[in-house]
Each structure stands twice: as C-alpha cells, then as structure tokens.
Design a protein with these regions (language model features):
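Conserved pre-ATP/AMP-binding loop-to-beta segment of ANL
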Residues: 21-22, 150-185, 192, 216-222
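Structural core segment of the AMP-binding/adenylate-forming
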Residues: 53, 80, 84-158, 485
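Gly/Ser/Thr-rich phosphate-binding loop
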Residues: 271-274, 284-372
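Conserved AMP-binding A3 loop
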Residues: 35-37, 173, 181-207
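Conserved C-terminal "lid"/linker of ANL adenylate-forming enzymes
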Residues: 452, 477, 482-488, 516-556
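Conserved AMP-binding/adenylate-forming core of the ANL superfamily
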Residues: 5, 14, 22-68, 72-76, ...
Length: 556
C-alpha cells in the first residue's frame, strides 16, 4: 500500500475551477450547458443564500433528483460551503425519502417537482427550506428570512461582487481528512438503507486513485454520466473526479435505456465509460449475441486465423458503437456475466471489471484492461490493502476485508451496524466472499448473506448459477432462490425479442424450460436447478440495477 498524502478535496475543486474557468463543465444531454465559471457563479449564490439562512458548517443538506446540472451544482455548493450533502436516490418511495431526510437531520432539501408532488413538508419537520432544484426557487420555507434571502439573492451577489466575479474570488471551505464529507445511503439488496459516513480522506483517496490509473484524462475529457449521481460509484467516477481535472460531464437526464445510452455515446464520444454490467450485457444481447450464434459464424469462429479476423471486426464495430474514443470501459457494481466476459476477452475489447462498495467511496480493486485477468476484478487499488479471511486465501474462499484511507467512518446513528462493519483490528468487512491469487488478483464468489449450503455443506453462490442462466438467449435476468429444499430459478425472459422472432409468451417459456438440462450440465451436481419459474415483468431493482433479492425469498 502506498503512503497516503491527504489533499483538501474542496481546494482541489477550487483550483480546478480557477484553471478551467472558461471551459465547459456540465451539460444536460441535448440540453443546457454550463462552463466552470457558470457553475462557480451558481455555487456562490447558493453560498450567500446558505449564509443568510444561518446554515452552519456541518449541517446536512439533502438532494433528491434525477441526474442534471443543478444536482451537481447543489452538491458542490453544499460541500464547498462546509455543509454535509446527503444524496438520496430519486427512485426511493416517498415514505423512504421522508425517513432519510429525517434520519439525516437535513435542514434543506433540494428536490425536483415530480418527487416533491409525492412528499409532505409536515412529514419532515426538521427542514427549514425546500428548494426546486431546476430553478432554485423556494417550494417551502419555515421562516421569513429564507424567503427574503431567495428574493434578494441576485442583489446580495451584486453587493458582494460589485465589479465582476473572477477566479480569484473563489475561497472554498478547507476540509480535513477525518471530517465528514457526506452521508450516502446504501441501496443494497437487503431492503434496509444505512447512512454511510464518508470522510474527506475517502474522497481524496479515490480521486488520487483515478488520477493515478487514468493519467490520459484531463480537461479535454468528455464523460457521459449514466449512473445515478446519488450512488457512490457514479458520483465519484462520472462526476466528482472529473470536476477536479476540468473535464466535461454530460448528464443523461432521462431513464438510461440501452438505446439512449448508445445514442449519447455515439454523439458525445466519451474518453472513459463507466457502467454497470447489466447495461453492457443488454448491448451484447441486442447487438451481438444473435450474430455470433448463427451457424455459419459459429463455424468460422472455430477456424484458426479466420476466427481472429472475425473477432477483430466485431471488436471494431463494438468500439465504434461506444463512441470510438474511449480509453476503456470500466464495469462495477455487480458481477459480469462470465460467458459474455469471455467473449469480450476473446475479441480483445478494452474493458475491465473493478470492485468496490459505498463504504469505500467506492473503490477497492481495479486493473487496467491491459493488465487484467479473466474473471478477476483486479488488484488492491492505490492506497488500499485487501485480505481474505481464510486459512488458504488462494484456494478456500473467505470474506474479503479491506483497509486504507478509503474506508468509511461508520453508519450514521447506528452504532451496532458500525461495530459489525469492522474487525477487531480495524479492517472493513465487505460481506463478500472470494479468493486471491499469488499475484494479488481478486476473484469474487458471491455475497456471504446470499450463500446457500449444499446437501453436504458445500457453499453455493446463487450469483454463479445466475451467470450461467443469463448466458442463454432470451434471458434478460434471473434469480436463484431456495424453495422447499431445492433451488428454483426465477427468470425474466426477453418477451419482446421472442415476439420479434415469431414466438409468443408460451412458446418462449417452453423453449427456456427445455434448456434446464443444459443449464444443469454447466453447474455442479450439488447446485442443480430444480425448476424454472417465469417473471411476467422485470425484477424490482436498486438504482445500480442489482435485483432486490429480499423481495423474492421463500421458505427454505
């Protein structure tokens, strides 16, 4: 592990804003664009409003909205003021949003109109202001001085900067290593959100990591932000890091369907692509799978020399479809389907799979695509150490544990969960099981909490079985559950594609059911799937597209 040297995150932002004053900073895809000077101006006005409202350093400010430029402005204004941003995923239900605003003790809420329609100020008595994020107009104010501050904000700004607002006027709050930077509520598959207390050292360490492994990125860089900015993965590597290097972030403000994503990538031509595996898997199934499974192509892919020519052509077309200008595609947030990964590996597509969690803000392991190994999620990231709680870490899986400046302070107002998060010697328990090879590459087996026990005590990780099932044509996604002593696969089929190929729902389900013996041939005897059940619609998911497993569990 390298020696970690802390740098103030807010001062890094201040320096970047000064250097890139006239460069583009934030855009809504096919919408408004702001230069760094525009962002700084909006931040300054919000700082003045915060002062007039007597918002103190360390006070909490909740932000609940879709990705957009003013989400970024609200977040940056809060943090550079010295207050604590509390990003809340816009897909949460109103009751959950009420709870998180109250639990975090937020004083101010930035929210968009659609979400606010389902909320009630009476259910959030600690708030003294609710702000419409699109326009920064007040939706609710508890005291007159807040209304006055909003009405006269431009006047106050003019008095503070009577001549002009210049880069040298910036003076952002100087943070310290163990100071609370933000509270980020998890959206995990267990159904209970915990407020992860992220310190500034964790943000700094992740920024240093990104600069170290991607030195090609700079103030000429374009990025398409398709992941929720309220989620740590998207926030850090599609937004916050980019702001410290003067890059240009393009927010997808609509639901990021594969069609919209591919359109945006083709137009923006980003220099780096950050994604969850499900997005890449959908692209593979819609654009590539049917081609490579054609009899003639399958045959040619087995012929030496010709196979490399075909693979090179497919890789070239895929790179072009993703904009043709990127260093690599970095995937994280969930397991990558093994069959699809093998295909990407064979065609030499520039991808890599990293590993992290909210509690590490988020990075734990990574390897550049030139240095990666098949099915591994890389080696310990800059400033980080990892270990496996196992008598033989190379052969016997154990819990993955990590240590370094990335790790969280704990869970907000939850001492019991915080205590469970750390080992006696201070390492963070990830709850994930894996092995590590002699060269330090990590291979994840699955979540400890999701693991089943086989008939003779064997460890069965449903994620590994689901990877096999998901590799079959017409399977969008699957979930393996324990069901009265056996294993049942819940499968969500691609009914739309089946229809295009001339199959109704019944025919498609029969086709998939007939493949159960083939599925079972690819998995160990002690983990055989007993039956398949079909989901009429997609699974309920977290914003990072993981299935909410707890909703589908049955009697064991």
């Amino acid at each position: 592990m390298n020696e970690f040297r802390f740098e103030s995150v807010n001062k890094l932002l201040e320096e970047s804003f000064r250097k890139n004053w006239d460069r583009l900073a934030l855009s809504n895809y096919q919408g408004v664009s702001l230069c760094y000077r525009d962002v700084a101006r909006r931040i300054e006005k919000l700082h003045i409003a915060f002062e007039k409202c007597f918002l103190h350093k360390g006070d909490k400010v909740a932000i609940c909205a879709r990705n957009q430029v003013n989400w970024a402005v609200s977040f940056l204004a809060t943090m550079t003021y010295g207050a604590v941003p509390v990003p809340i995923l816009h897909e949460f239900k109103p009751g959950n949003i009420h709870y998180l605003v109250n639990h975090s003790e937020a004083k101010v809420l930035f929210v968009d109109d659609v979400i606010w329609e389902g909320l009630s100020a009476d259910e959030m008595p600690g708030l003294f202001a609710v702000v419409r994020i699109n326009t920064f107009q007040l939706l609710y104010s508890k005291v007159p001085r807040i209304t006055e501050a909003r009405e006269h904000m431009n006047e106050y700004f003019g008095k503070r900067h009577p001549n002009s607002f210049e880069p040298e006027d910036l003076n952002y709050y100087k943070d310290s290593p163990n100071e609370l930077a933000m509270i980020n509520y998890t959206s995990g598959t267990s159904g209970f959100s915990k407020g992860v207390m992220i310190p500034y050292r964790a943000l700094c360490s992740n920024i240093q990591f990104a600069k170290h492994v991607l030195p090609e990125l700079n103030n000429q860089t374009n990025v398409v932000a398709m992941l929720p900015s309220a989620h740590m993965y998207g926030m850090m590597f599609e937004f916050l890091f980019e702001m410290t290097i003067g890059a240009h972030v393009h927010f997808l403000t609509r639901v990021p369907s594969p069609k919209i994503i591919m359109q945006a990538l083709a137009e923006v031509k980003p220099n780096i692509i950050i994604a969850v595996p499900l997005i890449i898997e959908k692209v593979y199934k819609s654009k590539i799978q049917k081609i490579v499974e054609k009899g003639s192509v399958k045959t040619l892919l087995k012929v030496p020399v010709i196979d490399k020519m075909i693979q090179k052509k497919i890789c070239g077309e895929l790179v072009s479809a993703f904009g043709g200008n990127f260093v690599e595609v970095i995937m994280g947030g969930a397991a990558f389907n093994k069959e699809i990964e093998k295909f990407f590996w064979d065609i030499a597509f520039p991808y890599t799979v990293g590993y992290g969690m909210t509690e590490c803000a988020p990075i734990i392991t990574y390897a550049h695509y030139d240095d990666k190994r098949l099915y591994s999620c890389g080696k310990a990231a800059l400033n980080i150490s990892i270990r496996i709680d196992s008598p033989d870490p190379e052969k016997i899986e154990g819990e993955i544990q990590t240590y370094g400046p990335n790790i969280a302070l704990g869970y907000y107002k939850n001492e019991e969960a915080t205590k469970d998060l750390f080992t006696e010697d201070g390492w963070l328990r990830t709850g994930d099981m894996g092995i590590i090879d002699k060269d330090g590459y990590l291979y994840i087996r699955g979540r400890y909490k999701c693991m089943f026990l086989g008939p003779n005590g064997q460890n069965i990780y449903p994620e590994e079985l689901e990877s096999v099932i998901n590799s079959f044509a017409y399977v969008v996604d699957s979930l393996v559950i324990e069901d009265n002593g056996g294993l049942t696969a819940l499968v969500y089929p691609d009914y739309h594609q089946g229809e295009l190929d001339g199959m109704n729902r019944e025919d498609l389900e029969k086709t998939l059911t007939s493949q159960l013996p083939e599925i079972n041939r690819e998995i160990p005897n002690y983990a055989k799937i007993k039956k398949i059940e079909f989901m009429p619609e997609d699974f309920e998911r977290t914003p990072k597209k993981s299935i909410k497993r707890y909703l589908y569990q049955r009697n064991k």
